[in-house]
Regions:
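Boundary regions of SH3-family modules and the immediately adjacent low-complexity/disordered segments
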Residues: 1, 51-81, 98
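Beta-loop motif signature
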Residues: 1-38
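Extracytoplasmic
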Residues: 6-10, 34, 45-47, 58, ...
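Residue-level detector of high-confidence beta-strand sites
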Residues: 24, 99-101
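SH3/SH3-like beta-barrel superfamily modules
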Residues: 27-67
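Exported/periplasmic cell-wall-interacting domains
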Residues: 54-55, 67-77, 106-117, 122-199
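Gly/Thr-rich phosphate-binding beta-strand-loop-beta motif of the actin/hexokinase/Hsp70
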Residues: 88
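Short acidic-glycine loop/turn motifs at beta-strand connectors
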Residues: 91-95
């Protein structure tokens, strides 16, 4: 399930159901996209566990489904990134739809593992030719930024200037994919789609 924050609303991200507020988020991401949260679990029919970059990796936060700030959609899709195999698999209802060869984070700035969600779909050219055609930003962050890195701490699936990146550990933590695969993902994958990154 995907929970979208309604325009004009704010949403409290809590440490647990009825717990303390860790952050408040609006209906737009820092990149200007509609905020769509991938729902990982539910509790007591009222509380939804979600991931958000505002609280860091591998930390679920809880949102009140009865707050009136959310609307819901569903997607049968899931992206599975296998860091060892250096592949990204698009799954629909558990069946493989497409298998991509990717580049991943190098030693010292590895791609973080865990369950995340697609938060933004952006034009790569608006940022740098190094990002290729397209950027799918994730709710994951990079805690091990390389010295001198100025590109922010968000993890994304994006392009590269070098086709030799695919099948290798070469990035500052992001997942590198070909422009043709990125265009497919941009067309196919809705905001809030779950992304599982594993070793």
């Amino acid at each position: 399930m995907i929970a979208e924050v309604r325009p004009g609303h704010a949403l409290a991200l809590r440490s647990r159901p009825f717990g303390r507020v860790l952050a408040r988020v609006g209906s737009r991401t820092p990149f200007g996209s509609q905020r769509a949260l991938g729902v990982v679990a539910t509790r007591h029919g009222r509380w939804l566990a979600v991931t958000d970059a505002a609280v860091g990796n591998n930390r679920l936060v809880w949102v009140d489904a009865k707050s009136g700030a959310l609307r819901y959609t569903r997607t049968p899709l899931e992206l599975v990134v296998d860091l060892s195999a250096r592949t990204l698999t698009v799954q629909r209802n558990g069946s493989t739809v497409r298998h991509l060869s990717i580049g991943v984070g190098r030693a010292g700035s590895p791609t973080p593992t865990g369950t995340f969600a697609v938060t933004d779909k952006l034009n790569g050219g608006a940022y740098s030719a190094a990002y290729g055609c397209c950027i799918l930003s994730l709710s994951a962050t990079q805690p091990n930024l390389p010295v001198g890195w100025t590109g922010g701490n968000r993890i994304a699936i994006h392009g590269t200037l070098s086709a030799s990146d695919f099948g290798r550990a070469v990035s500052a933590g992001c997942v590198h994919a070909s422009n043709s695969d990125l265009r497919y993902l941009m067309r196919t994958v809705p905001l809030g789609t779950p992304v599982v990154i594993r070793r």
